[in-house]
Each structure stands twice: as structure tokens, then as C-alpha cells.
């Protein structure tokens, strides 16, 4: 068989799914979340190209452990792409596309609006640019219109003097890095 079916327990939490040969360490780390980190419920899917090589789920959907986590249990996930974005930005730096201390406006002149001409790429990435929000209420259509969204982001005013203060740019960091 090209996959190993999984039906296991970790600290009383059922774990189900499959792992392809060579991906067994993913199962072990998945189980560790229950054994060592008091995970209640979780899922993990890994694809290599178009081929699924790991599909695991286990535990419970609720803290009182009455509803099992199923293969199709929905979960709200935040910040899952920030690591990928950071890797992409680091690769762009290593390939010489820009330097972290470059001003954003040196690559995106429209960004200089509203006294933002000195904000650096580093400040966008380290959450000190003063741009944690977009003041304009955005529609789904605007979020999907990258060119139009770029114009809105360029107009945005900072919420504080960039540099000395930090404030999590959780929703906006990806938008600015996209530019």
C-alpha cells in the first residue's frame, strides 16, 4: 500500500487518517501535540505537489471532550501564511530584489503619501511602521482588487510615528508585503 492508515490514541485522544511512507515523523509530531502540549483537537494535511501525503485528525472539537474531531471539522486558522510570507521576503532579500533598510517608497513610490516616505521594509516586517489597520472599510470586492487595494494602502495614514513603537500589523502586513 502507498499509505499507512492511522487509528491510534494519544493521551486518550483518538487520532485517525493516513501518512505516506517517509512521512511517519509527521504523525509522531502530531501525537506529541496531544501528549506534551495538551492539544484538545487538531488536523494536519500535507501535500507534495498535487499528492496528499499526510491527512491526520484527532482529539475533540470541544473542551469538555464530547464531540470528536472529524476529517471535515472546520477550524478558524489565523496567521498560517505569515511564516511563508516571511520566507518569501527573506528569499527576495537574499536574491537582491531589495534590502530590509530600503524605504518602501523606493520600490513603490505611491506609498510615500501622507508622510510615509521614510518607512522601511524592515519596519513593515517588524510591525513598527504604524500601519496596523486600514481605516477605510473594505469590501470583499476591494480586497480582491489588488491594484485598487494598493491605492487604498498607499493613502493610509500611520497610526503612530514609525520606528520606536511596535503594534501588531496582523491584518495589514500581508497586504503591504504583497505590494
Please provide the spans of the model-predicted regions.
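Residue-level signature of the cytosolic catalytic core of signaling kinases
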Residues: 19-22, 100, 117, 142-145
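Short glycine/serine- and small hydrophobic-enriched flexible loop segments
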Residues: 90-97, 175-179
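Short, conserved catalytic-motif segment at the N-terminal edge
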Residues: 16-77, 99, 155-156
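Active-site helix/loop module of the DD-peptidase/beta-lactamase fold
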Residues: 71, 76-80, 92-136, 154-155
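Hydrophobic (often cysteine-bearing) scaffold residues that line and stabilize catalytic clefts
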Residues: 22-26, 77-81, 85, 117, ...
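Catalytic-site signature segments of enzymes, centered on catalytic residues
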Residues: 134-179
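Short, compositionally biased leader-like segments
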Residues: 1-23
Amino acid at each position: 500500500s502507498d499509505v499507512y492508515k492511522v487509528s491510534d490514541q494519544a493521551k486518550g485522544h483518538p487520532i485517525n487518517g493516513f501518512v505516506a511512507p517517509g512521512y511517519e515523523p509527521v504523525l509522531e509530531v502530531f501525537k506529541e501535540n496531544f501528549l506534551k502540549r495538551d492539544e484538545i483537537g487538531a488536523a494536519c494535511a500535507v501535500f507534495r505537489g498535487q499528492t496528499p501525503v499526510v491527512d491526520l485528525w484527532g482529539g475533540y472539537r470541544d473542551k469538555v471532550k464530547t464531540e470528536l474531531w472529524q476529517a471535515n471539522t472546520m477550524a478558524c486558522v489565523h496567521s498560517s501564511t505569515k511564516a511563508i510570507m516571511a520566507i518569501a521576503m527573506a528569499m527576495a532579500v537574499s536574491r537582491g530584489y531589495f534590502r530590509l533598510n530600503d524605504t518602501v517608497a523606493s520600490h513603490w513610490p505611491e506609498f510615500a503619501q501622507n508622510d510615509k516616505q521614510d518607512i522601511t521594509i524592515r519596519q513593515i516586517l517588524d510591525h513598527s511602521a504604524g500601519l496596523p489597520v486600514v481605516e477605510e472599510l473594505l469590501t470583499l470586492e476591494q480586497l480582491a482588487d489588488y491594484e485598487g487595494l494598493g491605492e487604498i494602502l498607499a493613502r493610509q495614514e500611520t497610526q503612530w510615528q514609525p520606528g520606536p513603537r511596535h503594534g501588531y500589523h496582523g491584518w495589514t502586513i500581508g497586504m503591504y508585503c504583497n505590494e
